[in-house]
Amino acid sequence: STSVLQADKKEITIINKNENTTLTQTIAPIFEKYLMEILPQRSDTLDKQELNLKSDRKEKEFPRIKLNGQCYFPGRPQNRIVCRHIAAQYINDIYQNVDYKPHQDDYSSAEKFLTHFNKKCKNQTLALVSSRPEGRCVAACGDFGLVMKAYFDKMESNGISVMAAILLVDNHALTVRLRIKNTTEGCTHYVVSVYDPNVTNDKIRIMSESKENIKHYSLMDFMNVDYSLLKWSNDHVINQSVAIIPALPKEQLLMLKGSVDEITPPLSPATMNLLMAIGQNHQLTQLMIQLQKMPELHRTEMLTAYNSINLPGLYLAINYGNADIVETIFNSLSETGYEGLLSKKNLMHILEAKDKNGFSGLFLAISRKDKNVVTSILNALPKLAATHHLDNEQVYKFLSAKNRTSSHVLYHVMANGDADMLKIVLNALPLLIRTCHLTKEQVLDLLKAKDFYGCPGLYLAMQNGHSDIVKVILEALPSLAQEINISASDIVDLLTAKSLARDTGLFMAMQRGHMNVINTIFNALPTLFNTFKFDKKNMKPLLLANNSNEYPGLFSAIQHKQQNVVETVYLALSDHARLFGFTAEDIMDFWQHKAPQKYSAFELAFEFGHRVIAELILNTLNKMAESFGFTDNPRYIAEKNYMEALLKKASPHTVR
């Protein structure tokens, strides 16, 4: 029978009449009404209300949290919480409270939990797994008790009475709490409590007076699931593996070193998945050698190591920042022992490690700005490609790391201004070009990094003022030119960053006054001249920066009163005109260049009433005429007189 005592304190007492024992459990207030619905028959006694379980229990809705990595509080489906975050919060609460018990009230409702739940908690599990504490291991779920016994041995010898750990089973996170409890009668109890956030944060506890008894328990003994979850339990708890990541203060973690070295997990995809996730590099290295003896189908299954939501093990390793795991996978596959053991299709499937949304592991690493993982992948790729005879198209496809919308991964890097990550990728390209025979078209396509709509990443970088992105590309071009034949026109096409829309990247930079972007390009002009044989034909498009309607970015800068931009453009022409072979006629052609509206730059400035800019254009022309010695040029004299005459007039709108 079941009874409820002191209803205002939300406690239930479970009475086992056969063994004459009782167990009191505090429940969260939000679950009280569900308990009342499940057990609705009460007596009239106020101090002791007896409840009987109805036979139609299966027809009732229980406050369950689904095993898909997310939980929903009943009645409030918009309040979604990721279950592993709750598991991490449990551990956090354990160490923040003297009694080592989470405050039940913090978990009593969606509102209270969200108040209690801080922003750092999202990274709490990631930080715990990524820190790879001593004593972590992957074991068969049936050996769960064996691991607990090993922990108890270390705890007892080091005088520690309480520890906790996160458990990863498939895509599901739980927490376990171990406690050595000395009773007043002089007995020692070893208590293992597993908290399962997917089952309303209840716990299942097993207590024993002997450590030897603990080791006989499997993880399934601690699972509290209803009928709808039995298949998941049978698939992933009974016959699979569990990763156990201890959560102890740093000064105590060292005591777990060597505690589970003798635990050997079963050879299965689930084991591989968890080994990659928690960073067990030593065990993984040994398994990679064993895999060479397997048939290809089983070998591929082991190396992809999917969990039940189709996340590959390599993807999880990248997600948790396990660069050494990534390096082990790539380097092991690069060894001659693996040559010919995998088809190219299966190999690329393993290396790409895509999630269900089509995002590859490389895409994830670059998006997370994980330089170590990206460096490990790029460093290992040339040898791996040589071992398995990958062609340039396969390597190009891997490097572009397109998602389902066909956007290049470098598009997001450039758009977000992540210059450091871009530099890592571009620095790896020369070796990849040599070893994998990437073509000029493939390399330029990587540099343009267009999205699904054909918009280059450099367009977004220039539009947003990310001059560091432009600088990294300009600095990488000379070394790339040593490997492939990049022409001056290719560079102009790259730097103007034309999109399928009306504008170009350089046009937008001038319009918005991003001086850092413009200066970066113009400062690189001498290098472009020396390396790519730039001439005046190549320089003029950069100075004008026309959009698709042939409207110059210089004119747009004038229209938007970007005086610094205008001054920089004319100064760049003045500084580099001789280097690029400009003649007096070329200079006058530039000054008299007209937009589709039939205005020159000076006329446009005058038309919009920007007198300061108009005077700047005139003064720059006069200085260049003196410097280049064409003060007697008829075109110059006529243009000078025309501009001076306009400036003397009080009102605009008198343009010829």
Question: Where do the PLM segments sit?
Answer:
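Ankyrin repeat domain, specifically the short helix-to-loop turn at the C-terminus of the second helix
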Residues: 289-301, 330-349, 378-397, 426-445, ...
